[in-house]
């Protein structure tokens, strides 16, 4: 993208972007929630669509001049429906958190009970954390993973649901490397009269590619981000497999009296004007482009390689003596428990940064360290796979990470990090990000 104008007008902002471009191209991105969008997606996000206010929905806006942004939003909606097989979709949420907020606000009242995976066990802030709206406006109860297996015990989930009787159960995670049994979750939800929401922000691309089970057939609501494994712009989305009458009994007047609103009507109104105003039409245009890319055969090949790389890397880590929470991975990420390496997550993150490898410190289940220190790191393969890296690189990267972590207390750690950084730079040079240049 031409940056000559920006460089001349605002050298400081230009420099920050240039430096970030260099960081992305010359270092290895292993944060599980990050990826590289295509230049086509970035071009749509940087287009004139950013100038247009479009409160409302296609064909029913509060502003004039929306005929062309309507085209973009309809393309995004139609492509998302085809990609995931949903009857309803709202592509306007600004983020995954916004999407989750819209669902919770549309079917719950303040003080209602919800259940979600504990944040310290791999859940997400919006699934009931006490520092988040979801744990402050609603009575949140958290289920966790088994101390021995590191996996969710559905029997314990059922026991908690029977005791708590929540109005909504949330299945989803930000640091859980196994799958969710949404059929079992739905059976539990039906038993206690709860609604079921799947948050697939992390594995959405793998689900779209048909590599992981689609939760739409079991869940009342499915939310996701549009970046991460979907490789689109930063944003959110809400889907329903099929529409149904809203459970709160909200009605709408008709010519002959009134009727109960469909859930799609309630959800649309909750997104706008409920929690948002004008949608980000340039981002929605970028979402449309990304969904179009995800519908191509090449995306399925990409998603399959993401999982192969994660599995290969996890296996190599275990060969090197690392503990992976839940014993391995069935998606795009893994959570390394570093307690047997005598290194904290914070220390590992900082040392790996010096070595040109970006990961994030992460709490492990039953962690005795704070979220600012942690006992683990989270590693994901979406971004490295976008660069074209495969199993050979996955194995070597695990070995390089091991070199750094096992040398943490050595006096020559700086030299070791520098040597690893040079090899990482070579690996990245041999696997460039298509269309990116410093």
Swiss-Prot record:
The record marks 227 as: Plays an important role in substrate specificity. GO terms for molecular function: glycine hydroxymethyltransferase activity; pyridoxal phosphate binding. Its EC number is 2.1.2.1. Its main location: cytoplasm. It is an enzyme of class 2 (transferase). Pathway: One-carbon metabolism; tetrahydrofolate interconversion; Amino-acid biosynthesis; glycine biosynthesis; glycine from L-serine: step 1/1. It is found in: Cytoplasm. It catalyses: (6R)-5,10-methylene-5,6,7,8-tetrahydrofolate + glycine + H2O = (6S)-5,6,7,8-tetrahydrofolate + L-serine. NCBIfam families: PRK00011.1 (NF000586). Belongs to the SHMT family. This is Serine hydroxymethyltransferase. The gene is glyA.
């Amino acid at each position: 993208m031409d940056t000559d104008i920006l460089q001349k007008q605002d050298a400081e902002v230009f420099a920050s972007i240039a430096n970030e471009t260099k960081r992305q191209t010359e270092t290895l991105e292993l944060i599980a929630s990050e990826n590289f969008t295509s230049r086509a997606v970035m071009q749509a996000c940087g287009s004139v669509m950013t100038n247009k206010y479009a409160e409302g929905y296609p064909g029913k806006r509060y502003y004039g001049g929306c005929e062309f942004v309507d085209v973009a939003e309809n393309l995004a909606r139609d492509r998302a429906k085809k990609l995931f097989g949903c009857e309803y979709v709202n592509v306007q949420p600004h983020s995954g958190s916004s999407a989750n907020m819209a669902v919770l606000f549309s079917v719950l009242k303040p003080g209602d009970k919800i259940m979600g995976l504990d944040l310290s066990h791999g859940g997400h802030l919006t699934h009931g954390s006490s520092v988040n709206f979801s744990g402050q406006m609603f009575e949140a109860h958290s289920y966790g993973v088994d101390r021995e297996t590191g996996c969710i015990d559905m029997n314990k989930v059922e026991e908690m649901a029977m005791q708590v009787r929540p109005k909504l159960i949330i299945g989803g995670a930000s640091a859980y490397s196994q799958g969710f049994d949404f059929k079992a979750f739905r059976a539990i939800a039906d038993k206690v009269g709860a609604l079921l929401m799947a948050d697939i922000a992390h594995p959405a691309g793998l689900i779209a590619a048909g590599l992981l089970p689609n939760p739409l057939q079991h869940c009342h609501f499915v939310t996701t981000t549009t970046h991460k494994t979907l490789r689109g712009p930063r944003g959110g989305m809400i889907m329903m497999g099929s529409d149904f009458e809203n459970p709160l009994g909200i009605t709408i007047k008709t010519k002959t009296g009134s009727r109960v609103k469909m859930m799609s009507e309630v959800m649309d109104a909750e997104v706008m004007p409920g929690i948002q105003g004008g949608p980000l039409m340039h981002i929605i245009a970028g979402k449309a482009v990304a969904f179009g890319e995800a519908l191509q055969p090449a995306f399925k090949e990409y998603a399959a390689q993401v999982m192969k790389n994660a599995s290969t890397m996890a296996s190599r880590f275990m060969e090197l003596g690392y503990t992976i929470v839940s014993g391995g991975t069935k998606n795009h990420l893994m959570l390394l428990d570093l307690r047997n390496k005598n290194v904290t997550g914070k220390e590992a993150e900082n040392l790996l940064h010096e070595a040109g490898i970006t990961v994030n410190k992460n709490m492990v289940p039953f962690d005795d360290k704070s979220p600012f220190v942690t006992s683990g790191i989270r590693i994901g393969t979406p971004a490295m796979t976008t660069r074209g890296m495969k199993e050979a690189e996955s194995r070597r990267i695990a070995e390089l990470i091991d070199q750094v972590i096992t040398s943490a207390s050595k006096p020559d750690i700086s030299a070791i990090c520098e040597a690893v950084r040079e090899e990482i730079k070579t690996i990245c040079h041999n696997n460039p990000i298509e269309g990116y240049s410093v």
